[in-house]
């Protein structure tokens, strides 16, 4: 039996709220609604359930996982009488979402990540021994390359709780980023056409699979892992029309650079975009089915994203040209 006196500790913070868990053998996490205004764990809960239902109906073929959504707790729920004392002094009751905890990256692997990206031995030792950096999850950024000139001081500004792993770093480590792109394409198609939501601000992380999982990405560097989707508090319903597509396009471009982008800086980025695009259209067609009145929407969405990517690339080139002209003057 879990120890109900075992204290919760904060394992993450976001604009919606803080995330807590106890090292007592349970596998749940508590997301408190104590963040910025306008964010709602109630919406998180409802969208989470809707996406789980869609995933159950359209089973992904890739190693994709969604945390189980267990319960929504209100501030007057009896749960707080039994558990409030497990939070630090001064914390009060609030709405909270209880869901399955994503397994953390083992220390042996997160230590290798520190060695790879941190050349400062004193800082490296601190991060390896820091309890706050114990809950390591990896954010796969297929839409961004990290500059080779990145230095140690930049490392000091991010936590092992959410390590950004950029596409060129995946290439260097021999990770199967093509499979990651296919998995994201499947997930996006499932959310848009199965759950009918815009997928706004959802996050993808690489982490170990559930003990019961039969599918995973093999990797000598990261060990067996899967791709998890989380954070649904900003997700909204989308209509199956042009307005809904524009909403989905804006969400795609606004999100952190998890997905491949059509405006990448290298030829390999363009190839990965086309692979992602092809997989998204293929999976979308399977979900919508033959004869669907919405059959043309997935391709139109890709067109909107490509148009926006082209606009952003041109704007970036214009800024670079102005900067070069200024330097010459």
Residue ranges and their predicted role:
Residues 1-9:
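Conserved N-terminal boundary motif of the eukaryotic protein kinase catalytic domain
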Residues 40-43, 176-183:
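Short amphipathic alpha-helical segments
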